Every structure is written in structure tokens, then in C-alpha cells.
């Protein structure tokens, strides 16, 4: 297994969508459908996406189509950042990582109850905190170190880009098999420590420089 990690760029939009269409939730995950775009969307944009779902016919199918269209456009516009893991040219894993200033919210949340847009706490400017908000690995590749490879790449690139910290937001109430923000132990192994808590969200940081 020769895994390659690539930073998401607009020309990888097709691979990104293909991953979420066919492999990310092939085990019947309760998070399907998802295209990992809501972190980068304001509540107004999310409401617009709900209206678009109605135009697509409503119901689960309309919602999936609306999510998909929105995510594809956001990748092409460079609004979603992160890393795809590939095995023989097929995307099998994803990590959503971006400048903290580019997220409207972090931590676990349900799209049926989206938290209000909030200015980032503990982050005053760009290039200070690289945030890691989500992991998704194809079921047959879980437990093989793919998330660790993705996390290591995020931290290495963040250091090279001049960030002071990498920051993650695992939950203390979600079983590890469903923890799309990543389990605590993943971050502990990579040198992250608890920085603060916001409700059930554990804010974990790693000092990069």
C-alpha cells in the first residue's frame, strides 16, 4: 500500500467529489450525505443551500444534490482546504484543514442544528493557527494509519507556512468510530495537548515553532 497525500486544489475537485460520492460513507455511516463544506459556510449560505435542495426536488435526494453542488463549487473557488489521501490514484481519505480565520465554526455539530457564525476565539490573525476540523477515511482503510499520515502532513505544511500552532477539536462524547473531528488519541500521539474546553469540544493544540 503506497499512500500518497495531496493538498486539495481546484483541479482535484472531481477526485474530492468522487470520494464523498462513493467511498467516504460506503459503510452506511449516519453522516451521509456530507461533503465537508459546512465549516466554511455562513448560516446564510447554509440556508441558501437548503433552499437549493427544494429546487432539486427536496427530501434526502434534493439535500444530497444541493450539498454536492455547493461543495464542488467551493473546491473550485479554493474555499475548502485540506488533504486527500490516494491509493493507486483513487482518493481514500480526507482531512479538512485550513487557517482558523476561514472557519465559521469548529467542533462536532449537526447540520439540522448549525451553530451560529462565530469569530474565532484565541486567534487574532491569519497564519497563527492551522485548524483541523474533520477526517473521513474509507471504511476498508480505517485502522491503517491514514489519518496519522494526513495529520502529519498538515502539521509539516503548517510549520513550513509559518503557523505558530496546529489546533484540533475532538469531542469527549462521541465514540471513536464516529468521531469525524478525529479521536483524542490521534492528536495525543502527534504531540497535541488539551488547551481548553468548549462544551463537549476539547480544543487541542500543538506548538509548531
Task: Give, region by region, the residue ranges found by the protein language model.
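Short, flexible, glycine-rich and Lys/Arg-enriched loop motifs at helix boundaries
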Residues: 38-40, 108-114, 170-183
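Conserved N-terminal entry element of GNAT/NAT acetyltransferase domains
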Residues: 1-54
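Conserved acyl-donor/pantetheine-binding loop and adjacent beta-alpha core of acyl/acetyltransferases
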Residues: 73-77, 86, 90-134, 142, ...
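A short helix-loop-beta-strand connector motif used in the catalytic cores of GNAT acetyltransferases and
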Residues: 47-50, 55-83, 101-106, 131
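Conserved acetyl-CoA-binding loop-helix of GNAT-fold acetyltransferases
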Residues: 116, 132-137, 143-159
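C-terminal "cap" of GNAT-fold acetyltransferases
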Residues: 179-190, 195-209
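Short, solvent-exposed beta-strand-terminating loops
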Residues: 22-35, 95-108, 156-158
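Conserved GNAT acetyl-CoA-binding A-motif
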Residues: 129-132, 158-177
Amino acid at each position: 500500500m503506497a499512500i500518497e497525500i495531496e493538498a486539495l486544489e481546484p483541479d482535484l475537485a472531481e477526485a474530492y467529489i468522487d470520494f464523498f460520492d462513493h467511498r467516504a460513507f460506503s459503510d452506511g455511516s449516519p453522516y451521509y450525505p456530507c461533503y465537508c463544506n459546512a465549516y466554511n459556510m455562513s448560516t446564510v449560505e447554509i440556508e441558501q443551500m437548503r433552499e437549493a435542495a427544494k429546487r432539486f426536488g427536496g427530501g434526502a435526494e434534493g439535500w444530497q444534490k444541493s450539498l454536492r453542488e455547493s461543495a464542488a463549487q467551493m473546491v473550485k473557488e479554493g474555499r475548502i482546504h485540506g488533504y486527500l489521501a490516494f491509493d493507486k490514484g483513487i482518493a481514500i481519505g480526507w482531512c479538512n484543514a485550513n487557517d482558523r480565520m476561514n472557519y465559521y465554526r469548529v467542533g462536532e455539530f449537526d447540520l439540522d442544528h448549525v451553530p451560529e457564525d462565530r469569530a474565532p476565539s484565541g486567534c487574532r490573525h491569519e497564519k497563527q493557527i492551522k485548524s483541523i476540523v474533520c477526517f473521513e477515511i474509507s471504511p476498508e482503510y480505517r485502522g491503517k494509519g491514514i489519518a496519522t499520515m494526513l495529520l502529519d502532513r498538515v502539521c509539516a505544511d503548517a510549520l513550513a507556512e509559518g503557523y505558530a500552532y496546529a489546533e484540533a477539536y475532538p469531542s469527549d462524547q462521541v465514540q471513536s468510530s464516529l468521531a469525524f473531528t478525529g479521536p483524542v488519541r490521534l492528536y495525543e500521539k502527534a504531540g497535541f495537548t488539551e488547551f481548553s474546553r468548549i462544551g463537549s469540544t476539547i480544543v487541542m493544540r500543538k506548538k509548531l515553532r
